Amino acid sequence: MFELSTIYAAFERYFGKPPTRIARAPGRVNLIGEHTDYNDGFVFPMALDRATYVAARPRDDRIVRVFSVKFRDEDQFDLDHIVRDTQRQWVNYIRGVAKGLLARDLPLRGADLLIDSDVPSGSGLSSSAALEVAVGYTFQLLNQINLLGEELALLAQGAEHSFVGVKCGIMDQLIAALGEAGHALLIDCRDLSYRPIPIPTGVRVVVCDSGVRHRLAGSEYNQRRAGCEEAVRILRPALGKIQALRDVRSTDLAEYGHLLPPELLPLVRHVVSENERTLAAADALAAGDVVKMGQLMVESHQSLRDDYCVSIAELDTLVDLALAAPGCYGSRMTGGGFGGSTVSLVEAEKVDEFVAAMIAGYAIRTGRTLQPLVCTAGAGVSCVYASEEE
């Protein structure tokens, strides 16, 4: 459990004065619906009870000073001259959010920020979006700005596009802003509408970090997004006014898939089938059919492995181990891929046996130490401390 007193004291030690606000934004795990968000599709994430925290105090000038506890590093920039840092990626998330707020002609003053987090970095649990949303919300608190959750999510996404260089979809930022405790959200990434669906009390969501770190800013992620966009251009003359792969159905692909070059067909097949699986999974979980939900998770992993080619050996091993472990309904890789984590749906009464089996099995198969996280669906971004001092 993250202690607010720890970040409060750290801020006071570092900056010499106490913070006036502390905000938090959660990491997330996506139950199903992978690489669909930037195709205007459907996703089914839940916010975690692990989060990024920002302690803050306003300044009387235009300078923003930042200290990251996790990176043991600091940054300073002027709100009137915000540029990308070519050496340190973590600072660009913060600079990009500030730049985005200013681009909307919103009033900002300088601030001292101290950041800490218990969301593992690089594990596919969206630590980056948690940072962006937490920082954006902190600037709102300090400057009396009122943005809707959807607006905050779009602002954070824009920061990642322009300042970090990852053309991510909207899912990670949206669930960080709008998550509901005890629920997963079925999100339509085209119009940003969503439907909360309760997590059944008899199951647990378990995340297993492969220990392999990924770099989404690398070429693989952006190449796949570009491939999906190219496929839309190729299919549009045959299918009419389609805007994204979200508008393509399995029947369309069966009829017109021959128009696609061999390297694009598997990408499209994954996105189209994953959208259909995600809608079916949300209905299954809403009905309490965890067996069906688990089957769809397994199919999702197979598609990500074989068609989208974003899984790796360690993720495949974790899924294989999970499906053989006690109480597991289904398992899949989660996040962008090339490393990161798996997510498993597990019978609550057998979760301890499941965790023990995963730890032992992964050590035997890979020599790595596994630390499974039994997760609770948490709430979205919020202010967790406010002093009377302004």
UniProtKB/Swiss-Prot annotation:
Coiled coil: none
Main location: cytoplasm
EC number(s) reported in the record: 2.7.1.6
Binding, Mg(2+): S128, E160
Record: active site: D172
Binding site for substrate: E34, H35, T36, D37, Y221
UniProt keyword terms in alphabetical order: ATP-binding, Carbohydrate metabolism, Cytoplasm, Galactose metabolism, Kinase, Magnesium, Metal-binding, Nucleotide-binding, Transferase
Any GO BP: galactose metabolic process
Residues flagged as site, Transition state stabilizer: R28
Gene Ontology CC terms, in alphabetical order: cytosol
GO molecular function list: ATP binding; galactokinase activity; magnesium ion binding
Enzyme class: transferase
Binding site for ATP: S68, G122, S123, G124, L125, S126, S127, S128
Reaction catalysis annotation: alpha-D-galactose + ATP = alpha-D-galactose 1-phosphate + ADP + H(+)
Compartments, as annotated in UniProt: Cytoplasm
Keyword Cytoplasm among record annotations: yes
Protein's pathway: Carbohydrate metabolism; galactose metabolism
Similarity annotation: Belongs to the GHMP kinase family. GalK subfamily.
HAMAP family in the record: Galactokinase
Task performed by this protein: Catalyzes the transfer of the gamma-phosphate of ATP to D-galactose to form alpha-D-galactose-1-phosphate (Gal-1-P).
Name of the protein this chain belongs to: Galactokinase
